[in-house]
From Swiss-Prot:
It comes from Stevia rebaudiana (Stevia). CDD domains: GT1_Gtf-like. SUPFAM superfamilies: UDP-Glycosyltransferase/glycogen phosphorylase. The active site is at residues 26, 121. Leaves of the 'sweet herb' Stevia rebaudiana contain a mix of steviol glycosides, compounds that are unique in the plant world because of their intense sweetness and high concentration in leaf tissue. Stevia leaves have been used as natural sweeteners in South America for centuries. It catalyses: steviolmonoside + UDP-alpha-D-glucose = steviolbioside + UDP + H(+); rubusoside + UDP-alpha-D-glucose = stevioside + UDP + H(+); stevioside + UDP-alpha-D-glucose = rebaudioside E + UDP + H(+); rebaudioside A + UDP-alpha-D-glucose = rebaudioside D + UDP + H(+). This is UDP-glycosyltransferase 91D2.
């Protein structure tokens, strides 16, 4: 295996195994982290299922050893479903059930190869105890923001038992008592209603996360100290485990300018004035209603702003739901709007000089990508940690959340249009633009990013179980 000059000769080469959850929003950061560890001269084994590995072929570094796993069949899933993109959100619990069925194969790998470290995702609640019994050091790498993890519960035991003391709507819509500082990070009433479609029989995410946190030697956070000043120490206090920031792992803009999809979109963007276009993308796995899509579309129309909408037909709250754009919308906005209905090269679009703002669902990956390019955010969070992310970002004044009806979450075209214009046109938006530009300097500081990676790998080198045993003997 190729090695990097950055590892000192007298240090042992580690074998690190990484095992993400079956969602590309998790798989890609895990793959990126694996590559960075390998570039420091360590052996890395990346574990995922066969079909996902095939779909990753263009992303996999030759430095990484790929371990293909066979996902067990689960009756409720389509035959080739191996990632969250392959299923409706209400079927994700069955994908987790299938993922749990990987336990025997992963255990055999650990027994046969004895890695020094195993880095795993929140879903793999069964893994820490197995790794511990084999003398393997254990780390949970969270792609979820640290404030969202802290919001889940005051301790791993509380998460496991489902007993964090929050029993009323008021409890859930105010910052929890274990937050020792003022913050706006909390759900609102309409956010709670959105959690219901995602609940299903089986093992809860809180139980999974609690066992993962309780069984880990450390927690790896996709964050900077500068952005998680209060939150990283809070996580250490709540869970009594070292929290190691690994940096933001910002993705690289692809270099192939001849990609047919990008050529078409770029031609359209090139025809627009610099700093005039809003990019709209709500992710490919969120549940949105027909009413929300209509109000969002009509709000874009009402705003009068040029836009590119990455509109991969959204999934409705039920599998039978059909979600459509309003009649005549595409034709009426054809001169200033581009509705792109297949996969869109998000990084390239955000990097184009005509783009001036990003209407986003506030997934953690999209936040990084938007702020990398200094774009203020117009935030439309849908579920889970997305509302928590939006509240924190609004508090940091890098954008605003589109107002909804507090009780039922209803969206209006007027609130969409007003929010868009407030951020990218009106004078009040200057503060959001300035703060987003300042954050982009941090997000694009390659020296700082490399320092985080070096410190993280140094932590792995100094804190393996083998090192601890050597020190004791």
């Amino acid at each position: 295996m190729a090695t990097s000059d950055s590892i000192v000769d007298d240090r042992k080469q580690l074998h690190v195994a990484t095992f993400p959850w079956l969602a590309f929003g998790h798989i890609l950061p895990y793959l990126q982290l694996s590559k960075l560890i390998a570039e420091k001269g360590h052996k890395v084994s990346f574990l995922s299922t066969t079909r996902n590995i095939q779909r990753l072929s263009s992303h996999i570094s030759p430095l990484i050893n790929v371990v293909q796993l066979t996902l067990p069949r689960v009756q409720e899933l389509p035959e080739d479903a191996e990632a969250t993109t392959d299923v409706h959100p209400e079927d994700i619990p069955y994908l987790k059930k299938a993922s749990d069925g990987l336990q025997p194969e992963v255990t055999r790998f650990l027994e046969q190869h004895s890695p020094d470290w195993i880095i795993y995702d929140y879903t793999h609640y069964w893994l820490p105890s197995i790794a511990a019994s084999l003398g393997i050091s254990r780390a949970h790498f969270s792609v979820t923001t640290p404030w969202a993890i802290a919001y889940m519960g005051p301790s791993a035991d509380a998460m496991i038992n489902g007993s964090d003391g929050r029993t009323t709507v008021e409890d859930l819509t105010t910052p929890p008592k274990w937050f020792p500082f003022p913050t706006k990070v909390c759900w609102r009433k309409h956010d709670l209603a959105r959690l219901v479609p995602y609940k299903a029989p089986g093992i809860s995410d809180g139980y999974r996360m609690g066992l993962v946190l309780k069984g880990s030697d450390c927690l790896l956070s996709k964050c900077y100290h500068e952005f998680g000043t209060q939150w990283l120490p809070l996580l250490e206090t709540l869970h009594q485990v070292p929290v190691v920031p690994v940096g933001l792992l910002p993705p690289e803009v692809p270099g192939d300018e001849k990609d047919e999809t990008w050529v078409s979109i770029k031609k359209w963007l090139d025809g627009k004035q610099k700093g005039s276009v809003v990019y709209v993308a709500l992710g490919s796995e969120v549940l949105v209603s027909q009413t929300e899509v209509v109000e969002l579309a009509l709000g874009l129309e009402l705003s009068g702003l040029p836009f590119v909408w990455a509109y991969r037909k959204p999934k409705g709250p039920a599998k039978s739901d059909s979600v459509e754009l309003p009649d005549g919308f595409v034709e009426r906005t054809r001169d200033r709007g581009l509705v792109w209905t297949s996969w869109a090269p998000q990084l390239r679009i955000l990097s184009h000089e005509s783009v001036c703002g990003f209407l986003t669902h506030c997934g953690s990956g999209s936040i990084v990508e938007g702020l990398m390019f200094g774009h203020p955010l117009i935030m439309l969070p849908i579920f889970g940690d997305q509302p928590l992310n939006a509240r924190l970002l609004e508090d940091k004044q890098v954008g605003i959340e589109i107002p909804r009806n507090e009780e039922d979450g209803c969206l209006t075209k007027e609130s969409v249009a007003r929010s868009l214009r407030s951020v990218v046109v009106e004078k009040e938006g200057e503060i959001y633009k300035a703060n987003a530009r300042e954050l982009s300097k941090i997000y694009n500081d390659t020296k700082v990013e490399k320092e985080y990676v070096s410190q993280f790998v140094d932590y792995l080198e100094k804190n393996t179980r083998a090192v601890a045993i050597d020190h004791e003997s």
